[in-house]
UniProtKB/Swiss-Prot annotation:
This is ATP-dependent RNA helicase FAL1. It comes from Pyricularia oryzae (strain 70-15 / ATCC MYA-4617 / FGSC 8958). Belongs to the DEAD box helicase family. DDX48/FAL1 subfamily. The gene is FAL1. The keyword Nucleotide-binding applies. The keyword Hydrolase applies.
Length: 401
């Protein structure tokens, strides 16, 4: 199913937007005055009508307005800016006209595939420019000419410095998952890229969470942005059941996880740890106990990560142990259970993690392992998202089945 084509409409009706006054709602894609070839791609991709964020943001972005769009996972955010980029580019000019920066390689690759699918009838060129891949291939593709580049900040900045990614025709910069991008790790690289862009470049910021420091940051490179925002207390996904299990000692988490495996009939599950070392340790422990699991983190070679993702997408592996590299926008339909073996060290990542389950209105369950040291973090998450996380009931298997 295409992202957004199975959006929970009932949940959407209850969603309250805090949005700039000039934003109008376009209830159909036809009413947005999009190119005929793009409309064909949208319908072929599985969309029938725009989601709440799409119906508000696409026309504003196509008008050339700097835009801050905030909507929860699974509401069609990726397609919002993909459709907008495809509308404004001129495919007769084989130069990069739109640039998307994402915090992870997987997300950048996924965006490329969405752009190519939506632009199927437009003869569009789109390249994923990401670290961990062959530089020579990047250079060849960029020298050939790409209308849209989706990439990670480091590799994109490198290709611009080497003058293979030509910036003079760029008219739109999209920062996807901006909260993560603008965290300290990527801030300087984004500034590096931004310095090379034409002064009139339109900036679009898209994210599920927009902490105040991120909004403050956007003032540096946005002019009078139009805002399309969901109130923060609406951000926890509808249809998700959130539980915690109180565990006395860190050492007992593993036994608790094994007990859960015995009682749950799981379609697909993701288990999150905070460090790469913990992912490797837990993967080894689970395999020693004869549980079949796969694992992924940022230290792995890109080819290996791609292969693991593909296996998981196709349902060949059922349980994936990962760090937050997986938590940002990766679109796997079947995930019905998320276990936070470690609570996220950054509370903004909580929604990205649990947003993995129950996408597009599917039921999903999130289970948080909580030691006495974690109680304060759990309460902080509850307050931040205005949500309630209950102790896990005995019949949790029935809720997932």
């Amino acid at each position: 199913m295409a992202e957004g084509s199975g959006i929970d409409r009932k949940a959407e009706e209850r969603m309250e937007f805090t949005t700039s006054k000039e934003v109008t709602v376009h209830p159909t894609f036809e009413s947005m005055a999009l190119k005929e070839s793009l409309l064909r791609g949208i319908y072929a991709y599985g969309y029938e009508s725009p989601s709440a964020v799409q119906s508000r943001a696409i026309v504003q972005v196509c008008k050339g307005r700097d835009t801050i769009a905030q909507a929860q996972s699974g509401t069609g955010k990726t397609a919002t800016f993909s459709i907008s980029m495809l509308q404004v580019i001129d495919t007769a000019v084989r130069e990069t006209q739109a640039l998307v920066l994402s915090p992870t390689r997987e997300l950048a690759t996924q965006i490329q595939s969405v752009v190519m699918a939506l632009g199927d009838y437009m003869n569009v060129q789109c390249h994923a420019c990401i670290g961990g891949t062959n530089v020579g291939e990047d250079i060849r593709k960029l020298d050939y000419g790409q209308h849209i580049v989706s990439g990670t900040p480091g590799r994109v900045a490198d290709m611009i410095r080497r003058r293979h990614l030509r910036t003079r025709h760029i008219k739109m910069l999209v920062l996807d998952e901006a909260d993560e991008l603008l965290n300290q790790g990527f801030r300087e690289q984004i500034y590096d890229v931004y310095r090379y862009l034409p002064p009139a470049t339109q900036v679009v910021v898209v994210s599920a969470t927009l902490p105040y420091d991120v909004l403050d940051m956007t003032t540096k490179f946005m002019t009078d942005p139009v805002r399309i925002l969901v109130k923060r207390d609406e951000l926890t996904l509808e249809g998700l059941k959130q539980y915690f299990i109180a565990i006395e000692k860190e050492d007992w988490k593993f036994d608790t996880l094994c007990d859960l495996y015995d009682t749950l009939t799981i379609t697909q599950a993701v288990i999150f740890c905070n460090t790469r070392r913990k992912v490797d340790w837990l993967t080894d422990k689970m395999r020693e106990a004869n549980f079949t699991v796969s694992s992924m983190h940022g230290d792995m070679p890109q080819k290996e990560r791609d292969s693991i993702m593909q296996d998981f997408r196709q349902g060949n592996s059922r349980v994936l142990i990962s760090t937050d590299v997986w938590a940002r926008g990766i679109d796997v339909q079947q995930v019905s259970l998320v276990i936070n073996y470690d609570l996220p060290s950054n509370r903004e990542n909580y929604i990205h993690r649990i947003g993995r389950s129950g996408r597009f209105g599917r039921k999903g369950v999130a289970i948080n392992f909580v030691t006495s040291e974690d109680v304060r973090i759990l309460r902080d998450i509850e307050l931040y998202y205005s949500t309630q996380i209950d102790e896990m009931p005995m019949n949790v298997a029935d809720l997932i089945a």
